[in-house]
């Protein structure tokens, strides 16, 4: 037995999963599945991953799941942006295979996915909340999803009865209330009214904590008067100090959006809570600090509604006598910058956007209060769900089940590295690929749109970044070009090429990418 990355959380000692009494449900060979997915709910704000914001997180129910299940410490996104990440979760494939490269792409209904496989295995399936994949959901017996990415207040829900593809129009019907509450209401109702002769799988997808980070009135005064601690690199103005090779998206852009939404609401895409924002004119340091405080306050209030509604879902399982035989997963589609490097948003292969905070509970099989450090990615999720359901993974799935890892038995051949690729090209955030293992990270910013949708019509000079996460966990010093790491960098370059071949991401049809690779990707060099 290989038990690397597996440990007992001391805080969980003495805590047992809560279950209710007998019900009229039929005996089942395979467990029910409750898959809860949020948007941009980054690990820094969960409270179970440590960090400067951990003491401030409203996380009673996330902490309950952690105490009763297993926390993944190294779950990563393969393309840190909402639409591609969700497609990878469903299909078990990287973007170049499932065809969803950028925010503007759609998942084809005919594409195989885990919901279809669960149906074939005898499951009743439901999808509620944020879909964002533009075409009609396939593989679900019932769905009620937002138009596009949805709104926080009085969102439009679309069902099979009134479906319209996102690019054809809004369709659907407005439902009054706050979106996180409404999604939970619908999920609870579906669970209670389910076909009790079959196992179920419900995908409960929240919009929160996506920008504009709104919150229900019951959390409007949470954190009043609180001054949040700052990340050590909040005051990183530009790349000179760290040696990073791109501009990034600074917090000042968020303040500009707040001002635009307040002064010209009719022509801005969304609203934000608690405007106007009054910055500090003429003092860039004080201004950035003020922006950070508002962003984190809004964000944590928004996140509090997620935790609150996770509690409602867990209580429903208890009341229905389902807790013991239901796999409960809570995960975010990717992480998010909360002022680290002076940034907000995601996309970049830095730790904050790359990490997918993930907790899972299955009392029959997963030891309570454990943590697992194995490298897992979102392309593995579909295979895990298929494994629990006794189903086949989606066709051409590239991931593998980590069920045995969760029980403390990691296969000897389990991957030690993960491969990442962000396809959208922007001047401030160039397209890039990279590799990460348990200590090092290597990123190649190739800086070309390669015909991808949603990209700027620009080219960025190709560049490299390398980080030693053991000595520099916050990625404050780009060590590419440091002779002390030349051997490691060369080995990781070669391994990244091998992973590209393994995952069939070889850009064989792109003469432009071949030119970039031949000119700027020299596996034997750490200086190119």
Located regions from the model:
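Formylglycine-dependent sulfatase
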Residues: 6-8, 15-464, 473-494, 501, ...
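N-terminal secretory signal peptides that target proteins for export/translocation
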Residues: 1-4
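Extracellular, beta-strand-rich glycan-interacting domains
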Residues: 469-471
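C-terminal alpha-helical interaction module
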Residues: 513-514
């Amino acid at each position: 037995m290989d038990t690397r990355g597996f440990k007992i959380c001391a805080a969980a000692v003495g805590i047992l999963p809560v279950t209710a009494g007998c019900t009229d449900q039929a005996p089942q060979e395979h467990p029910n599945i409750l898959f809860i997915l949020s948007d941009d709910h980054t690990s820094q704000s969960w409270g179970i991953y440590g960090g400067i914001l951990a003491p401030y997180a409203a996380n009673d129910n996330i902490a309950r799941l952690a105490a009763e299940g297993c926390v993944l410490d190294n779950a990563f996104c393969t393309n840190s942006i909402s639409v591609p990440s969700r497609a990878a979760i469903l299909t078990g494939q990287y973007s170049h295979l499932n065809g969803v490269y950028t925010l503007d792409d759609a998942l084809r209904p005919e594409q195989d996915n885990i919901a279809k496989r669960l149906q074939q295995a005898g499951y009743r399936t439901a999808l509620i909340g944020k879909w964002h994949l533009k075409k009609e959901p396939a593989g679900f017996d019932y769905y009620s999803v937002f138009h596009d990415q949805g709104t926080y207040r009085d969102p439009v829900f679309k069902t099979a009865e009134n479906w319209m593809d996102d690019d054809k129009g809004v369709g659907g019907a407005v439902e009054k209330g706050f979106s996180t509450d409404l999604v939970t209401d619908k999920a609870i109702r579906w669970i209670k009214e389910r076909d009790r002769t079959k196992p179920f799988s419900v995908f409960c997808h929240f919009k929160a904590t996506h920008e504009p980070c709104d919150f229900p009135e019951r959390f409007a005064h949470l954190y009043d008067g609180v001054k949040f601690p700052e990340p050590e690199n909040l005051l990183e103005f530009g790349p000179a100090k760290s040696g990073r090779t791109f501009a990034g998206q600074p917090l000042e852009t968020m303040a500009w959006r707040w001002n635009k939404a307040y002064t010209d609401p009719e022509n801005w895409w969304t609203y934000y809570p608690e405007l106007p924002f009054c910055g500090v004119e003429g003092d860039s340091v004080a201004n950035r600090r003020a922006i950070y405080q508002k962003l984190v306050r809004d964000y944590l209030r928004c996140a509090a509604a997620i935790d609150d509604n996770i509690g409602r879902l867990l209580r429903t399982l208890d009341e229905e006598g389902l807790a013991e035989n239901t796999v409960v997963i809570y995960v975010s589609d990717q992480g998010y910058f909360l002022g680290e490097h002076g940034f907000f948003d995601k996309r970049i292969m830095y730790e904050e956007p790359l990490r997918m905070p993930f907790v899972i509970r299955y009392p029959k099989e997963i030891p309570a209060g454990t943590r697992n450090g194995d490298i897992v990615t979102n392309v593995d999720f579909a295979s895990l769900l298929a494994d629990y359901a006794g189903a086949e993974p989606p066709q051409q799935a590239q991931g593998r089940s980590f069920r045995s890892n969760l029980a403390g038995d990691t296969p000897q051949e389990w991957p030690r590295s993960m491969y990442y690729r962000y396809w959208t090209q922007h001047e401030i955030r160039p397209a890039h690929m990279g590799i990460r293992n348990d200590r090092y990270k290597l990123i190649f910013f190739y800086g070309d749109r390669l015909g991808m949708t949603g990209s700027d019509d620009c080219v960025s000079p190709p560049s490299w970044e390398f980080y030693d996460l053991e000595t520099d966990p916050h990625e404050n010093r780009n060590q590419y070009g440091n002779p002390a790491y030349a051997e490691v960098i060369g080995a990781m370059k070669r391994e990244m090429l091998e992973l590209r071949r393994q995952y069939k991401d070889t850009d064989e049809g792109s003469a432009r990418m071949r030119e970039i690779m031949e000119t700027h990707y020299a596996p034997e060099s750490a200086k190119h």
